[in-house]
Amino acid sequence: IARGRVAVAVLNGGMATRFGGDVKGIIEAVGGRSFLEVKLAQAQRFGRVPFLIMNSFATHARTLQFLAGHQLGDVAEVFLQSVSLRLTPRGDVFREASGRVSLYAPGHGDFPGSLRRSGLLERLAERGVETLLLSNIDNLGAELDPLLIGFHLARGRALTAELAETLPGDVGGAPAFVGDQLQIVEGFRFPAGFDFNQVPFMATNTFAISIALLEREYPLSWFYVEKQVDGRTAVQMERLVNELSS
C-alpha cells in the first residue's frame, strides 16, 4: 500500500430509496459524514491511495456535484457504467407511465468493462497499481486493510473474496461449488427455498482483485431479472461482478 501498488474502488450506482430517493453514496451515514466521505477517509488513512467511483446514469451528476461542493474532486476518479433499456416480459421496450423509455444500469458486473473503457485501468497500471479493493459504497466494514491485501498477495490468486459469518435470516450471495469450482454464487441462483443457514459464510461483494484479471475480457453471464416499475413487470438483463470468481 505504501508503495502505491493498491487502489480502492466503490460501486456507487444505487439510489437510497429508503432515505428519500437520493444517491446512496452522498446521504449521511455516520457522524455527519456521507458514505462516500467515510469510504474516502478509510482509504486515505494510508496516504494518497487512488480512489475510484463507478457511477450509474442515475447517480453521476449528483455525485460530481457533491464531490465539487466538498472539495473532493481532486481525490477521486469517477467513471460511468453503461445504461440499458428495460423490456416487457414479451420483449417490447418498456415505457414508464409518462411514455418515456425506462432506463436502468445493468448490474455491478459492468465494473470490469466500464473500468477498461474509461481508460482508468490503463492509467492505474502505468502508475504501478497491482491490486484493487472493490466494495459497495454502503458497506463501511469493507475498508482497506493491509491484512486482507497481504493475504491476497500471499495466496497468489487473481481474486480474493471477503466473507461474513452467516446470521439468522441472511440471504444473498455465498460461496458454493459449481461442479468442482468454488465460487461466489448470487442468492437467486440457489434452489428455491434454499436454507441459507446451512451456509457458514455469506458474500459481501467485497473483493481484492489483481489488475491483470481486469485487463482481459471476461465472459460474465447475463441474468434475467424482473422488477416492478410503475406497478407493472419490467425485465432487466444484469451481470454480476462476483462471477469473476468462477
Regions found by a protein language model. Give the residues of each.
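N-terminal glycine-rich phosphate-binding loop and ensuing alpha1 helix
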Residues: I1-E77, L85, F94-V101, P112, ...
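A generic structural motif
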Residues: D74-L87, T160-T166, D230-G231
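Catalytic core of tubulin tyrosine ligase-like
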Residues: L124-N136, G141-D145, G150-S246
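Residue-level detector of secondary-structure boundary/capping sites
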Residues: M54, A58, S102-P106, L115, ...
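Fold-independent oxyanion-binding glycine-rich loops
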Residues: G13, S56-F57, Q81-S82, H108, ...
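Short, charged, surface-exposed secondary-structure boundary motifs
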Residues: L87-G91, G169-G172
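Conserved adenosine/adenylate-binding substructure
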Residues: S98-R127, T131-N139
